Amino acid sequence: RTTRNKDEGRGSPQGSPLSPLLANIYMRRFILGWKVLGHERRLDAHIVNYADDFVICCRGTADEAARVMRSMMSKLKLTVNEAKTRLCRVPEESVNFLGYTIGLCHSAQTGRSYIGTRPSAKKIAALKAEIHELTSRRWLWTTVEDRVVKLNRKLRGWSNYFCLGPVSPAYRAIDRHARHRLRQWLRGKHKLQSRGTSRLPDARLHDKFGLMRLCDRPRSFPWAKA
């Protein structure tokens, strides 16, 4: 923890429940003003936000939308994080928002291209790092049941959120990594010399030890969730 907020006399500590509440209050004023002042209709620019993270989706009016946004933020005495602010032309470019990459996707069924969402490379890498930590050598003293329970909990939570768009490539990559890491952990725990998969095939990891296979999970869409 730092004393930056206290020293500067502004802001709230990161992780404080007050932070998202204040963010929603100020963003509500900004979004209402955007609509009431007619910017949404005039610029055909629609705001999508979560707390203080937001994107403005528009057609050919990005420069003007950015100028108006900065002007309104200034009047609300809010500071725009310029390091995280940029103009993005989709589908030539992609943008990351709330862990998803929004950009050009390809349909596996038709082969056609479309603008859609997929889990971002950063979030996939972060999950792989967490799987690696859960199967590191410092956990060799635990049981395989304990490792699988913790791995499955992590995999289930991640896939419950990342279930939109073409997720199969990400799921396959994560499944491979989870199997590889659990296999490495089992070799270390039981001092197995074989480096192949003959003694620890995929079926054994999933069927005997119970490791979750993301590719077999039914798709769970947000509008069907409580």
Residue locations for each model-derived region?
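Non-catalytic terminal/accessory segments
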Residues: R1-A226
